[in-house]
Amino acid sequence: MLPSVTKAKYVRDYLIEVKFNDGTKKVIDFEPWLTGPIFRPLKSKVYFRKFFIDSPTIAWPNGADIAPETLYEA
């Protein structure tokens, strides 16, 4: 079964608590991924907090997202 994000909750800074479809829960630090043009706006913590679940992963209004497998392995 491929991992899929079912819940996500902002913790602080660039940390998001993520729950996956197999019940696994993790607090993930997204800061290491905030490089390159698509992720640059996410360096603003106000913008970073605008994430949403776009099944099967977490995404932002500008189209940025990170593969759910990458999140699961983090």
Model-predicted segments: where are they?
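Motif-centric detector for short Cys/His coordination patterns
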Residues: 1-74
